[in-house]
Amino acid sequence: VFFAGP
């Protein structure tokens, strides 16, 4: 899973 916030 990949998550990138602002």
Curated annotation (Swiss-Prot):
The keyword Ion transport does not apply. Processed by the macrocyclase-peptidase enzyme POPB to yield a cyclic hexapeptide. POPB first removes 10 residues from the N-terminus. Conformational trapping of the remaining peptide forces the enzyme to release this intermediate rather than proceed to macrocyclization. The enzyme rebinds the remaining peptide in a different conformation and catalyzes macrocyclization of the N-terminal 6 residues. One of its GO terms (molecular function) is toxin activity. There is a cross-link at V1-P6 (Cyclopeptide (Val-Pro)). Transmembrane segments: none annotated. Keywords: Toxin. Belongs to the MSDIN fungal toxin family. Cyclic hexapeptide that belongs to the MSDIN-like toxin family responsible for a large number of food poisoning cases and deaths. Cycloaminide B is non-toxic to mammals but shows immunosuppressive activity, probably through the inhibition of the action of interleukin-1 and interleukin-2. This is Cycloamanide A. It comes from Amanita phalloides (Death cap).
